[in-house]
From Swiss-Prot:
Keyword Glycoprotein: no
Stretches the record annotates as Disordered: 231-266
Family matches, as InterPro entries: AB_hydrolase_fold (IPR029058), FSH-like_dom (IPR005645), LovG (IPR050593)
Keyword terms of this UniProt record: Hydrolase
Gene Ontology CC annotations of this record: cytoplasm; nucleus
Family note: Belongs to the LovG family.
Organism: Anopheles gambiae (African malaria mosquito)
EC number: 3.1.2.-
Identification of the protein by name: Esterase AGAP003155
Cross-referenced Pfam families: FSH1
Catalytic site positions: 114, 172, 199
Amino acid sequence: MSKVSGAGEEKLKVLALHGYRQNADSFKSKLGSFRKMLNKYVEFVFVSAPHPAAPLEAVGGEPDPNQRSWWFNKDDRTFKGTNQGGPAYGFDESLRLVERTWQAEGCHGLLGFSQGACFVGLLCDLSARGMTTMKPQFAVVASGFRSGSLVHLNYYENKVQIPSLHIFGETDEIITKDMSEALAETFLDPEVVTHPGGHYFPAQASLKETYVDFFRDQLQQHLEAKELQNATEENSFHLEGQEEAEESALQPVHEGLQNGSDSDSD
């Protein structure tokens, strides 16, 4: 059985999806302490959403290329987590980008914050229904919520059956506690971690053990599954070789019988 050990061993690759009006670089920076906690077990892959978001100061003004959005759920091409019954402009383009990145990087799991966490929930559901090439082994969801876009309302009919860690603040006023709890309930056996703060990704020392335990468990499961797959493929290879050898051994006998039959006919 494979065991998680020290530096130099295989790590998990986790695709990290930022929140609304963030980008890959800003999210990577915000997760600095979190990444440091998990450096032994995880390599994070960051990608920016394809759509420029309207600047916070002047909605309707010129988009800031550094502020990005995975999709827009309002007709003015902005996004708000509490919006219900709206569109999902740009979602398909973001889905294709994330699928390409996942494939190119060889990722194992997903992590998301806020809008990115909402996206993670949708991706996990799509994967469970075989509607994406992505097959995440686990998910980490911070300040997540269910999408209220009309095209996403049927995404939550069946519970997602992969390990998941859900993190949210007791006093979050942007994505409230009940919104994050509603997303957690769409997973079969969610692990829930709360903190007393608001809308941010917590990385205080008191949570280190929880984070390390979760990712160490996922790495252990990944290594064991990989070991089992390798053993199965090796066994299949040996069986095929044995069958070919047996067929080769029988071939001269068949030829001899055929030759004997020809002689008798003469």
